Amino acid sequence: MCRSVRVLCVAGDPESLRALRMAATAAEWELTQGATNQTDALGLVDAERPHSLVAFGDWAALVALVRERFPAMRIVTDRPADGSDAVASSLDQVRDLLRASRRPAGPVR
């Protein structure tokens, strides 16, 4: 069974989320529903089990929680945060940073 790579985008408001999702769109992965608050983001992490999280805005607490619960998840942010794997200085860097991330491997159980 093939398993597509899933990416969760989180931003502070719907307009920023739309822009981030557009910047993160690529044929190599599937975007999950995005979130604009921590509660929804954590719910999506639990439900969708994304491989990567892209968080633009003040999401240090979310990044720390996700890193603690899912140490292997790739996390891209727009500012330095404990637990972030990469920092994008602009929306234009998001795709390249996601492409540089690890891919899931092994059987799906």
PLM feature segments, named:
Residues T36-S52:
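Acidic, metal-coordinating helix/loop segments flanking the phosphotransfer/catalytic sites
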Residues A55-G57, R74-P80:
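Short beta-strand elements of ligand-binding domains
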Residues A35-T36, S89:
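Short beta-to-alpha connector loops in regulatory alpha/beta signaling domains
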